[in-house]
Design a protein with these regions (language model features):
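Short aromatic/hydrophobic "clamp" motif used to bind/position activated sugar donors
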Residues: 79
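Short beta-strand/loop segment that forms part of the nucleotide-sugar
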Residues: 30-38, 55, 83-84
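Acidic helix N-cap motif at the loop->helix transition within catalytic regions
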Residues: 16-19, 41-50
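A conserved acidic beta->alpha catalytic loop
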Residues: 36-45, 59
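Alpha-helical repeat scaffolds
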Residues: 224-229, 259-269, 296-301, 342-351, ...
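Short, well-formed alpha-helical segments that are part of the catalytic scaffolds
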Residues: 8-31
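Catalytic-site signature of metal-activated, phosphate-bearing donor transferases
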Residues: 65-71, 82, 89-222
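Generic helix N-cap/helix-start motif at coil->alpha-helix transitions
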Residues: 201-207, 238-245, 273-279, 290, ...
Length: 647
């Protein structure tokens, strides 16, 4: 019987991830080929649990050589290439199998898969990026890899192949900080690049991959230099040129080189107006410059173009499917927040959550707005429509969010759905007892404290609030880690608040701690305590932070009253003036926003978007002339942009 799929992998010291990878694919692959380049851990022993085809290969600083060795052992009709730090969602395996069973093999036709990478400290705190890469192709056609690093797939004559999108997604954890450091990937890759430069010199693709290396390390100056060299030397039909231009655009924006970003946008992406990338990039540039109406128009076009194309083809994007979904939707949500448009906030939150129901920040934003305008039963109904087939993980997350909003009824609703109460965190038990006014429940939760709870600052915050609420010295139970100096400072600060002996200088030095305490009291609906301690901890810095907190949480009347206090004392900062300007613009009183924008620019002349807002909303020509001149002197790159010139 002909084997349908051969999985080919090269590995070295992958004992922490290879089992996850192989278990995710073992039900799909008819043959698993493992080429080991020198493991000293249990990698091979784990691999032997899944296959007898484990081969040793002497590492020669050449990924292509190792990859091609693995391909030489494959006997399946199709070849899939994975790395050990990648894995499939097992629910997708049946769809994958149907695809390769039904797909007609054509000469020199290769397939890209979608790779979702987690980048950051850990999966929980990671940023998620999505890219495509050729990993699936028919066997026995001479298709092989070339270049020692960031290897590419070519045909038997060494010619790059055209790529077709496959409906396959894998997940990649190799960019997590611990993995990068442990495997010393950057130094390993640098050594390979050095050898390559000495032996044969660099081709444009090498400069592109070197740029990727620097970008991963966060060295964007060197990354941009490499990307620019690659872009300048490359043929316009190179398959990676769009990725290179995208990276250049992103770094230009990071360096405030907006005109250069505009140029690369139109030089490359304007040729693809039916795809989302052009409009998503343009929308992000408009938003950055403070031109929100143009930004919304472009971002909506990106989203709608992707929707229209996706009904015709799987390949509805040029670089990354997120440019047709999460990227424009997230930016549209951000603008809706600036404009305080609750209907649009709800709409965009729901759209984002339909793609990723575990986006904590977006879910929290949605719930914040829903609780302002909907009954508790209506809120639950909306959540249940978004998060379908809810799991225990969902109940725990929703319980946590509604606790943070001080909504004990809905929090209790989701708590009752949690089957194993031991999964509820100590933090959530403590806050639950506070909003339910149960001192006994709080005491019982305290008994569960463990030394590792010292790394959670919210536990100490809950203990402090309980001390104030019940006038009980729970503060003696504060938990700390090895940072003794910081611990003593926090304890001293809390003691002064409790004893009403706090000085203004103490507040200045600990303003974040004070603001967190007061805003949490408000969130938990401990209004009596809030009123007491806002008087005791009254300081312009605290009032400013609270005013902004109220404004961004749609407590407009409270925000305005706090801003008025600051105006009376002449203590308003630029963020307050900006929020008041937006408040007037959003209410249709653009002329009244101008004085607030003027004050904001005085305090923050580096706020480039403020000048756009001024030129858009000011009617007085003398004012416009003055700020156009200042804008030109401070931001020469900006005023070269066509849409800025027209203001």
């Amino acid at each position: 019987v002909e084997k349908l799929l051969s999985l080919c992998m090269i590995v070295k010291d992958e004992e922490e991830t290879i089992d996850r990878c192989l278990s995710s694919i073992s039900g799909l692959a008819d043959e698993i080929i493992i080429v080991d380049t020198g493991s000293t851990d249990l990698t091979k022993e784990i691999a032997y649990k899944y296959t007898e085809h484990v081969f040793d290969f002497k590492w020669s600083n050449d990924f292509s050589a190792a990859r091609n060795k693995s391909l030489s052992y494959a006997t399946g009709k199709w070849i899939l290439v994975l790395d050990a730090d990648e894995y499939l969602n097992t629910d997708d395996c049946e769809r994958f199998k149907k695809f390769i069973e039904n797909e007609q093999i054509e000469q020199n036709k290769v397939y890209s898969i979608s790779i979702i990478s987690y980048v950051g400290e850990s999966i929980r705190n990671a940023n998620v990026t999505e890219s495509t890469m050729v990993r699936l192709f028919p066997n026995n056609q001479g298709i092989h890899y070339f270049r020692p690093i960031h290897e590419q797939v070519v045909d038997a004559n060494g010619i790059l192949l055209s790529t077709t999108v496959s409906p396959i997604t894998v997940y990649h954890t190799g960019y997590l900080k611990d993995t990068v450091q442990k495997k010393d990937k950057h130094n390993r890759n640098q050594a390979i690049f050095s050898e390559l430069k000495q032996s044969s010199g660099f081709i444009p693709y090498d400069y592109f991959t070197i740029g990727n290396e620097y970008a991963t390390k966060g060295d964007y100056k060197k990354a941009l230099y490499s990307y620019e060299r690659a872009f300048k030397k490359a043929a316009p039909n190179n398959p990676w040129i769009l990725d290179c231009a995208s990276q250049m655009f992103t770094i230009y924006m990071k360096f405030n080189r907006v005109h250069d970003a505009w140029e690369i946008l139109h030089q490359v992406f304007s040729h693809y107006p039916d795809y989302p990338e052009y409009h998503a990039f343009k929308g992000s540039l408009y938003e950055y410059a403070g031109h929100y109406s143009l930004a919304k128009e472009s971002l909506l076009t990106a989203f709608h173009n992707a929707e229209a194309l996706s009904r015709k083809t799987d390949r509805f994007f040029l670089i990354n499917p997120s440019y047709g979904s999460i990227v424009p939707l997230s930016r549209l949500l951000k603008i809706a927040k600036v404009e305080q448009n609750k209907e649009e906030i709800v709409y965009y939150c729901i759209k984002i959550l339909q793609a990723n129901s575990h986006d904590f920040q977006t879910l929290n934003t949605l719930i914040t707005v829903l609780l302002l305008k909907e009954s508790e039963s209506a809120v639950i109904t909306t959540i249940n429509k978004i998060i379908i087939n809810q799991t225990q993980r969902d109940f725990i997350l929703l319980h946590k969010i509604f606790l943070s909003h001080g909504n004990k009824e809905i929090a209790k609703y989701y708590e009752n759905k949690i089957e194993n109460r031991s999964l509820i965190s100590i933090e959530d038990l403590l806050f639950s007892s506070i909003i339910n006014s149960s001192e006994q429940q709080f005491k019982e939760a305290l008994l569960k404290l463990q030394p590792d709870n010292a790394d959670n600052p919210k536990i100490n915050l809950a203990i402090m609030i309980a001390t104030l609420k019940w006038q009980n010295p729970f503060i003696d139970m504060l938990v700390y880690n090895e940072n003794q100096i910081k611990a003593e400072q926090q304890l001293s600060m809390y003691q002064k608040i409790i004893n009403n002996t706090i000085a203004q200088q103490d507040i200045v030095q600990n303003v974040t701690t004070v603001h967190t305490l007061l805003s949490t009291l408000f969130e938990l609906k401990q209004f009596d305590l809030f009123d007491i301690y806002i008087d005791q901890l009254n300081h312009p810095l605290v009032i400013s932070l609270l005013a902004n907190y109220f404004y961004h949480n749609f407590e407009t009347n409270l925000a305005v009253s706090f801003y008025n206090l600051l105006l009376e004392q002449n203590k308003m900062d630029d963020s307050g003036y900006i929020n008041l300007a937006h408040l007037h613009i959003n209410s249709g009183y653009s002329a009244d926003a101008v004085p607030f924008l003027e004050e904001a620019i005085k305090l923050n002349p580096n706020g480039h978007h403020l000048f756009s807002l001024m030129l858009i909303h000011a009617d007085n020509e003398d004012i416009r002339k003055r700020y156009r001149k200042q804008y030109t002197s401070l931001f020469a790159q900006h005023v070269k942009l066509p849409f800025i010139k027209q203001l």
